[in-house]
Amino acid sequence: MADEKNDLTRRDFVALSLAAGLAAAAGDTIVAAAEVEVHNVVVKTPDGDCDCAFIHPGTGAHPAVIIWPDAFGLRASMIGMGKRLAADGYSVLVPNPYYRMTKAPGIDMNGFSFQNQADMAKLRPLMGSIGAAGAAEKDATAFIAFLDAQKPVDKTKKVGAQGYCMGGPLVFRTMAAVPSRMGAGGSFHGGGLTTDQPTSPHLLIPKMKGRLYVAVAANDDQRQPDSKDKLKAAFAAANVPAEVEVYKSNHGWCVPDMPAEADKPIYNKPEAEQAWSKLMAMYKAALV
């Protein structure tokens, strides 16, 4: 293990800037939450030292999963998702996507507003650091190499990746960067999955070999109604097994601590649980 160290909307910004525990876990292994271990680790990448949380069951070797955080970075809610996965029998790495510029979390969520230019001036460069060409690909390769070297990871099993908001495109980039190791990827209210740029994440689909589940927010679909069809067509053309599903909830609905927008809560627990259930079913089938 690495050294341990104890008038722009949310969805519009993500698209422009970066372009379920209800099911059983892999195999027959389910562990109690009390048996989950959480470690602060450092993963060395070509661009520096990435601070991460490594979360795994207390005993045994298990399929690995990478969680790409949303724009608010590595924090308690993301670690909570990792603990939930670990309790279902997965070994999970949650990286700080902004390590090139700052330690986690990088952004103070208290009082943050996507309409506040001062807040945005802090966030844009951070998102740009992971959105840069080649950054996520280098990170994904380093993360998987780290995971494959850990005793709690069964490296004979495929790896999963899930991402929220800006993490959705990072899942696509991960799936394409290390296709031989990736078994499944989930994008939840991912921003900018289809653009008119040559770097659009959906153009990476032919490089993928694993399964994908793309959960689309209602307001993202309203803003870009043809995106889901572009994704479905790209998956079909590449013979990549995938499901693209539009939810009734708005962008950010899967993340428990997502700040309210216009005094309305974003997190929608019932639909978040539905999405989690879909993810777990995919992991159970694909991370073998």
Language-model segments: residues:
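N-terminal cap/leader regions of alpha/beta-hydrolase-fold enzymes
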Residues: 2-288
